[in-house]
Amino acid sequence: MTVSTDNTSPVISRASSPTFGDHGKDFDNNKIIPISIEAPTSSAAAVGAKTAIEPEGRSPLLQRICYLVKIIAAIALFVVGIAALVCLYLGSVISTPSLILMLAIMLVSFVIVITAIRDGTPSQVVRHMKQQIQQFGEENTRLHTAVENLKAVNVELSEQINQLKQLHTRLSDFGDRLEANTGDFTALIADFQLSLEEFKSVGTKVETMLSPFEKLAQSLKETFSQEAVQAMMSSVTELRTNLNALKELITENKTVIEQLKADAQLREEQVRFLEKRKQELEEACSTLSHSIATLQESTTLLKDSTTNLHAVESRLIGVMVQDGAESSTVEEASQDDSAQPQDENQSDAGEHKDS
């Protein structure tokens, strides 16, 4: 998210530096002096602050299919469990293929149910929220840095405005003294050059603006004729025009400073909003962690119940095997009892024939 852009405020500097060697011809330079101001834009920051945290979701059709499969698996697990309990209660014998099929259905259903429970936990949402919290922390740090930079720019612009005001005052005084002076210009020009040297420390842009005035001072040293004085007075008139441009520049800088202050307040509001959002997300993460712990306990209980169900199945299989062995023993005993009367009848019939 972009927090600052470079805005360039062009100021047209019209400074006339008369060259007295050309017999009163005015040397007019129209120069555009850009002043680079780092002004923040609040639209991108507001859009970033209003960005909602939404967990990654699946397509509606896939969600419905997964939900249907989970329901079918739960129903199958329940039906197989009920069937096993009914068979145990009635003591009916289950064939080996049917038993294997029931066990396979139970295992598959159990795996699907466990997967559904795992997918049902909001772990993905928790991870996404943690990433959002980290991003908000980085954004918060970056916004703090941007605010500090804006404050530094604000201080620098204020200092430049104060120095430009002083330059405006000195140039006005110089113009008044120049209009009133009709004698020696040596002291006046030396004072003027000294003032220009003091204002070179403001920056390269202001130094560029002062270059016409330096040419003017050099020209005043070369000649002091009446015609040169008149040309210089016309130059002072244009200097006043340039001073008006400086006044407009000062007004524009004041407007920029007010905008910077408003943007700094907006950054502070965004920082407070992000901190509040961070606290809410931390509370949500703690709640989700508690839910995950509860679901893990439920999973443990479900595993215990499945273990008990396997134990019941093992007992059922043992009981069925024991019942089958007892039934086979009873059938063999009944066959032996029926065979003994037949042998006795055959022996009686043989004795009757002999008699």
UniProtKB/Swiss-Prot annotation:
* Topology within the bilayer: Multi-pass membrane protein
Q: Could you tell me where the Polar residues compositional bias lies?
A: 1-19, 325-348
Q: Which residues form a coiled coil?
A: 243-298
List localization entries.
Secreted; Host vacuole, Host pathogen-containing vacuole, Host pathogen-containing vacuole membrane
Q: Which UniProt keywords apply?
A: Coiled coil, Host membrane, Membrane, Secreted, Transmembrane, Transmembrane helix
Which Gene Ontology cellular-component terms appear in the entry?
extracellular region; host cell membrane; pathogen-containing vacuole membrane
Record-annotated membrane-spanning stretches? 67-91, 97-117
Is the keyword Membrane in the record?
A: yes
Predominantly, its location class is secreted
The UniProt annotation puts the region (Disordered) at: 1-25, 320-355
According to the record, the residues making up region (Required for membrane anchoring) are 54-118
Q: What does this protein do?
A: Chlamydia replicate within a host intracellular vacuole, termed an inclusion, which is formed by fusion of many smaller inclusion bodies. IncA is probably involved in the homotypic fusion of inclusions.
Subunit and interaction comment: Forms homodimers, and probably higher-order oligomers too.
Provide the family line.
Belongs to the IncA family.
The entry's free-text remark on domains says:
IncA proteins share the same general organization: a short N-terminal domain, a large bilobed hydrophobic domain, and a C-terminal cytoplasmic domain.
Q: What is this protein called?
A: Inclusion membrane protein A
**Gene behind the chain:** incA
